[in-house]
């Protein structure tokens, strides 16, 4: 989590260096890219040799700092992850990757961006049990509400195609843990960004974590007390036996 936090901070600092005209130009280039790859088949990022020939400038578009194009925030599990260009092994080890054959996650009708990560990493948080998630590109925040979760075969990625009039972002990862024979898709549909909604989710998450921490603390105290009482009983029995012998 520390490295992810540092990367997110680097992105936020880098985004501040762009003025309004420069940001508008980056969005324009991203929109052009999205139009150019419309209708292109999506390749499974976890299969060796997958991928398509892409424009030479792909990694330059929306590149704020060190290959990062934005951040993904999932308030219900209290996590913010950096989003990088591409889905190389190196990228997936340190954050979320953008599948190149899909739209840049800048929103817009008829777009379907796909982001991927390694579900199996011990320190990774799962893309499950989501409610709302948020994409930040520069200072623009896009809100998505989970509307579909499904498990598919890696040979059938037709669900990742864009739909007319829809604005989707799908989070893709391997499943089940340790086997990785299928793909878990968590799709979100664009909603109006309301900061108060995100704050409410964050507050709910904090309360839940506090209750869990309190419960764990009580459980530990009970276990310690039981262990102490058991030790006391054994010690008392030994003392009683010695007294009886005397």
Task: Indicate where each model-derived feature is located.
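Solvent-exposed, non-transmembrane regions of membrane-associated and secreted proteins
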Residues: 1-211
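C-terminal single-pass membrane-anchor helix
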Residues: 200-246
């Amino acid at each position: 989590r520390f490295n992810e936090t540092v990367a997110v901070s680097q992105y936020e600092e880098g985004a501040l260096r762009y003025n309004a005209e420069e940001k508008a130009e980056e969005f324009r280039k991203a929109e052009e890219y999205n139009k150019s790859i419309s209708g292109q088949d999506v390749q499974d990022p976890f299969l060796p040799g997958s991928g398509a020939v892409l424009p030479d400038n792909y990694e330059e578009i929306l590149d704020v700092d060190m290959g990062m194009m934005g951040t993904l925030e999932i308030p219900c599990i209290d996590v913010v992850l950096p989003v990088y260009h591409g889905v190389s092994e190196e990228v997936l080890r340190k954050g979320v990757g953008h599948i190149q054959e899909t739209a840049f996650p800048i929103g817009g009708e008829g777009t379907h961006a796909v982001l991927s990560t390694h579900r199996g990493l011990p320190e990774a948080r799962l893309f499950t049990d989501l409610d709302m998630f948020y994409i930040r590109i520069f200072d623009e925040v896009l809100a998505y509400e989970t509307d579909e979760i499904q498990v598919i075969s890696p040979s059938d990625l037709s669900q990742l195609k864009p739909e007319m009039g829809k604005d989707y972002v799908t989070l893709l990862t391997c499943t089940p843990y340790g086997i990785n024979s299928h793909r878990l898709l968590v799709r979100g549909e664009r909603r109006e960004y309301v900061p108060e909604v995100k704050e409410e989710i964050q507050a709910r998450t904090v309360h839940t974590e506090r209750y869990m921490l309190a419960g764990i603390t009580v459980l530990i105290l009970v276990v310690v007390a039981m262990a102490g009482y058991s030790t006391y009983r054994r010690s008392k029995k030994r003392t009683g036996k010695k007294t009886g012998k005397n």
